Amino acid sequence: MSDKIQHECGVALIRLLKPLSFYQEKYGSSRYGLHKMYQLMDKMINRGQDGAGVATVKLDVETGTPYIDRLRSIEPKATQDIFSQINDLYINAKQKNPESYNDIEWQKKNIPFMGELILGHLRYGTYGGNNIQSCHPFRRQNNWLARNLLVAGNFNLTNVDELLEHLVELGQHPTVKADTVTVMEKIGHFLDKENDRLFKQFKEKGLTNFDISKEIQKNIDVASILIESSKRWDGGYVMAGMMGHGDAFVLRDPNGIRPAYLYKDDEVLVVASERPVIQTVFNVDIKEVRELKPGYAAIIKKDGTFTEKEIIEPLERKACSFERIYFSRGNDADIYKERQQLGRYLVPNVLKAIDYDLENTVFSYIPNTAEVAFGGLVEGIDEYINKQKATDILKLGTNITESTLGKILARHPRIHKVILKDAKQRTFITDDESRDNLVNLVYDITYETVKKDVDTLVVLDDSIVRGTTLKQSILRILDRLHPKKIIIISSAPQIRYPDCYGIDMAILSKFIAFDAAISLIKETAKESVLINLYDKAKAELLKPKEEQINVVQEIYRTFTNEEISQKIGDLLKPKGLNAELQIIYQTIEGLHQSCPDNLGDWYFTGNYPTPGGNKVANKAFVNFMEGINERAY
């Protein structure tokens, strides 16, 4: 991807289902769970590099023994930093207690992070500072085991203000406006209520406080806590939590916006944001890893009992299509095929753009995430060529010669790795003009791959958000090869609307497609349209979010996709570019055909799966009209 965009986040939960001694005997280490968590997090590093966190809960420890351990880091290699610190704890313990160290029970009692429950998180920050306090898991402490709570998630809620007001109504005094704190306190509030309910129930039966605590731990209704906590949530989320006594859960939003996958055998239960990560770390077949259903929670009790329960009535499935295009690891079997299909669906428009002149066309891609879609594009071009070959051979009939046949069979798409990405250049120069010159050299080219002033150069990117890197760097350096024409194709459709479910695409003015539409409106003397829409958007924002419509969609209805793409090309064309420039985007139909199970496309279409999405779009437009450069939620 030429434009780097961030998103939240990666989450993993492991519950060991056997005693720690089992893993020592079978796998040679009582730290089996920690090793697996490290591998899961290391494999999901694509999902978060702003920080990381790990927490564990020890089951059935003696009074006076710490049972919750947590470590978070914002170091450049946060996951490695965390597990290096944890490893040092074991090294120190072994050096100081060589005689006791090999005793598993001694380890559990005396060494931190020897828990049977392990929660890991990788963070990409879309809101709030990049500090240690922003890193998950978050902890709500209490002296009672069953009132302790740890939460980590891949989520974004659109209605934090509303949820904070509800916390105030409940008598709380929140000090931070953040969805992470809001979620923690909502779950914590209903966890407290459930504890109070059970305490009263067992007190009436005459049990002592000590015995009541034990009964509460056995009887806590995790599902009811989640049902009450999530009633007002509007957003996309996978929420994972652990309670101090040993219950744990993972809850997915009712539209299935954010991904979660689950694997369970008789040794371990694991939930993670990505399927192939589980497959690789636990060496299991794709059929053994299943998706956590939207609106459901995976709940595991302290005694190891596992259930999946409906928490929120599932709504229309709108799983995030950007996960398939870009965010998720490309080695997932289905995602790999889907990205290939995205490339294939571009073939007809590409052939039309080059006037079917494959002899004078070079195909390439922008490294590295576009590689799989590029493979699909090339396969589609190859199929077209093969059909042409067959037609030409049949036309020759008995007049065919070895020389003629050889020329026909020699036709193939011209594929070159034209553009290369070098390591980031470090610089202390801060003025914008100098930075622009330096970014030019982040990408390099392979010389003599293009016939000067003859060839068309077709380059695939997986998406174009702002287009800054294309304009400042890629197009300029491609032009040094002297192609007659440069065609940039995007395997994703035009990004037109803000995301509010965890992707860092929240400000309208940062979308080149929005800039193009606004430019077209101004060129056609229709600026009154913007004023009218501004008034409409403000009026919509006075309504409850459930009644609002997305007025931003009206901006794009005046123009065809092709007109907007053409204007994008005009806006992205750097001064002095000699080659003709054309931009081609994936169609919505092509996206849906390629990714049939992930139809969440609100950033392309403005069709938000939750009411909060329309509110965010309207607020984003009002911000644009008022010159406010901040996100709308």
Regions picked out by a protein language model, each given a short descriptive name:
Residues 1-293, 299-362, 366-367:
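Conserved short alpha-helical segments that host acidic/polar catalytic motifs at enzyme active sites
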Residues 76-130, 375, 380-386, 397-448:
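Cofactor-binding active-site loop characterized by glycine-rich and histidine/acidic residues
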Residues 94-105, 199-220, 383-411, 524-534, ...:
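Short mixed-charge
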Residues 230, 245-247, 252, 259, ...:
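PRPP-dependent phosphoribosyltransferase catalytic core
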Residues 232-235, 338-359, 372, 377-381, ...:
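Phosphate/ATP-binding catalytic cores across multiple sugar-kinase/actin-like superfamilies
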Residues 304-320, 365-401:
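Terminal amphipathic helices with adjacent charged low-complexity linkers/tails
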Residues 363, 463-464, 486:
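Hydrophobic, well-ordered secondary-structure elements that form the walls
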Residues 456-473:
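A phosphate-binding catalytic loop at a beta-strand-loop-alpha-helix junction
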